[in-house]
Amino acid sequence: MAVDDLKVKPMKDQPDQKSNGKKPKGLRFLSSPWWCPAAVALGVLCLGSLMTIIMLGMQLLQVSDLLKQQQANLTLQENILEGQVLAQQQAEAASQESQRELKEMIETLAKRLDEKSKKQMELNHQYLNLQEALKRMDNFSGPCPEDWLWHGKNCYLFSSGSFNWESSQEKCLSLDAQLLKINSTEDLGFIQQATSHSSFPFWMGLSRRKPDYSWLWEDGSPLMPHLFRFQGAVSQRYPSGTCAYIQKGNVFAENCILVAYSICQKKANLLRSE
């Protein structure tokens, strides 16, 4: 083969694709008459989408800021509410403490008032008793009538006339009294001292009679043992009875029909302290 045969043929010798009236397949869309409007529409769509995204992003930011602000407001309101609740709880606790202290104070005052009322009532009672005692003292002439001797709880009258025992008993009864009755060594000492300076005998309210001849006082009570000892003969018994008398502080027994002075006795009119 010759070298000339290897030379490249000029382009004109090659078949022209344009001349054949055929277009390349890859460039068919670009040459379409709808390409430009479609591109514009797509761009507008993309721009609208971008604007929508931007607007949505801005709205999202606004919503986020609003949510943050609302959250902050809620937190602030919650803190305020917690403070108010705490303050209310503290106020309730303080109120309860004040009520407790006030209740204790009222109870203390009521107790003091009750004590003062009781004391006032007691003072009023004492005042009334004092007034009553003063009234009694105004009308009080003494524990014993005139000419009577006062000793302890009793009054004693030494008679100025002599009678037998029964008549002496009647005289004492007429004075709302009885013949002398000795119940204690203290009473005995007073009578012994009162009669020690007189030589006259004085009937006592002590006698013994049938059937057992026991020594009995007018009211029927027996003589206390060892209270005093009889002087002289005491064993003799008389039909009219044996009666006791006291003379110069000593006690004797004699026939009741004999005459002697007497000692009457009755309760003293003592003021009673109430």
Swiss-Prot record:
Lineage per the UniProt record: Eukaryota, Metazoa, Chordata, Craniata, Vertebrata
Annotated membrane topology: Lipid-anchor; Single-pass type II membrane protein
Swiss-Prot/TrEMBL domain comment: The cytoplasmic region is required for subcellular sorting on the cell surface. The C-type lectin domain mediates the recognition and binding of oxLDL.
Residues exposed to the Cytoplasmic side: 1-31
Protein name: Oxidized low-density lipoprotein receptor 1
Entry superkingdom: Eukaryota
InterPro entries reported in the protein's UniProt record: C-type_lectin-like, C-type_lectin-like/link_sf, CTDL_fold, Ly49_N, NKR-like_CTLD, OxLDL_rcpt1-like
Organism: Oryctolagus cuniculus
Segments traversing the membrane: 32-54
Ranges where the record places region Neck: 55-150
GO CC terms in record: extracellular region; membrane raft; plasma membrane; receptor complex
Biased composition (Basic and acidic residues): 1-16
Topology, Extracellular side: 55-274
Positions bearing carbohydrate: 73, 139
Swiss-Prot/TrEMBL keywords: Cell adhesion, Cell membrane, Coiled coil, Disulfide bond, Glycoprotein, Immunity, Inflammatory response, Lectin, Lipoprotein, Membrane, Palmitate, Receptor, Secreted, Signal-anchor, Transmembrane, Transmembrane helix
GO BP terms, alphabetized: immune system process; inflammatory response; leukocyte cell-cell adhesion; lipoprotein metabolic process
C-type lectin domain mapped to chain residues: 151-265
Function text: Receptor that mediates the recognition, internalization and degradation of oxidatively modified low density lipoprotein (oxLDL) by vascular endothelial cells. OxLDL is a marker of atherosclerosis that induces vascular endothelial cell activation and dysfunction, resulting in pro-inflammatory responses, pro-oxidative conditions and apoptosis.
Lipidation residue positions, type S-palmitoyl cysteine: 36, 46
GO terms for MF: carbohydrate binding; low-density lipoprotein particle receptor activity
Residue ranges of the region described as Disordered: 1-25
